[in-house]
């Protein structure tokens, strides 16, 4: 029961932390130079978190306070808002990285993690926009309180013994890189299709919660190239007939393609000397950047 609860808590926090969501919203109406600065900040924050880091020495209360205070002050003078934005994106990246690693290390239940993500995403819908700060805080509070006990559990400590840093791996160039090429090529294909679809299907400003739900799916796998082909057909159909249904179909197939990549990556690389959690986090952050930037 405790393992099930911990899995749900991890999912609740993962659904609440979407790196760049609020930061990209703060760039609406800004100059191209300002938007480029945001992209550079996001890239630097991700690279700084993609490093060897022992989750046992992490205390989530610091990032919880930064995220909470940053979301409470969205309308500030430009200089102060830039500082808030930088602090927020760094905390979101670090928190998401830790959560991704913990899900890979712990013997967690994928359906429970997915359920937690679904609950968080539901409360991020537009009908709850006025309570977004409170909802985010409520979603992050359980992991903030529970984290200390979670990392001292026997399951976590046993899993941590298998979770070796990529830089210390002797087989990285021989095995892991070959596996990585396949996933990277598939991801770049879908990423390109997502970018093209975003430009030509005139996606409205929204939270894209349906798309994020499909991306986080853990129940269905689809051949990535079939998903890409169906997404391209949806783009062409949407260009010929301006119907909202084709945008939904497009998001569904692209999302299923991304989720299939992540599910295959988790099963293939989980027990190898590779930071699979970091790679999953990197893929997710790139998808979020493509979907939300410039909307």
Curated annotation (Swiss-Prot):
Pfam families: Herpes_U26. Keywords: Membrane, Transmembrane, Transmembrane helix. InterPro entries: Herpes_U26 (IPR009980). Its main location: membrane. GO terms for cellular component: membrane. The chain crosses the membrane at residues 31-51, 66-86, 103-123, 131-151, 183-203, 218-238, 243-263, 274-294. It is found in: Membrane. It is a multi-pass membrane protein. The keyword Membrane applies. This is Protein U26. The lineage of its organism: Viruses, Duplodnaviria, Heunggongvirae, Peploviricota, Herviviricetes. The gene is U26.
């Amino acid at each position: 029961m405790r393992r099930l609860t911990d899995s749900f808590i991890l999912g609740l926090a993962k659904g609440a932390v979407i790196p760049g969501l609020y930061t990209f919203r703060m760039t609406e109406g800004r100059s191209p130079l300002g938007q480029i600065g945001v992209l550079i900040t996001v890239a630097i924050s991700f690279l700084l978190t993609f490093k060897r880091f022992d989750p046992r020495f992490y205390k989530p209360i610091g990032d919880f306070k930064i995220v909470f205070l940053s979301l409470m002050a969205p309308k500030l003078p430009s200089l102060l808002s830039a500082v808030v934005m930088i602090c927020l994106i760094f905390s979101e990246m670090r928190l998401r990285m830790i959560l991704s690693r913990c899900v890979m290390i712990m013997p967690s239940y994928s359906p429970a993690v997915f359920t937690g993500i679904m609950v968080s995403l539901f409360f991020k819908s537009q009908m709850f926009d006025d309570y977004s700060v409170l909802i985010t805080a409520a979603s992050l509070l359980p992991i903030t309180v529970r984290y200390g006990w979670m990392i001292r559990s026997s399951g976590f400590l046993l899993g941590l013994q298998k979770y070796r840093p990529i830089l210390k791996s002797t087989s990285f160039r021989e095995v892991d890189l070959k596996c990585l090429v396949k996933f990277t090529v598939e991801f770049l294909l879908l990423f390109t299709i997502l970018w093209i679809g975003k430009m030509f299907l005139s996606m409205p400003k929204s939270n894209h919660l349906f798309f994020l739900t499909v991306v986080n799916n853990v129940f269905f796998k689809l051949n990535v190239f079939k998903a890409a082909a169906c997404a391209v057909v949806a783009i062409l159909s949407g260009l010929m007939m301006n119907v909202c249904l084709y945008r939904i179909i497009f998001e569904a197939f692209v999302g299923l393609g991304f989720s299939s990549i992540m599910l295959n990556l988790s099963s293939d690389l989980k027990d190898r000397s590779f930071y699979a959690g970091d790679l999953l986090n990197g893929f997710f952050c790139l998808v979020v950047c493509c979907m939300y930037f410039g909307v």
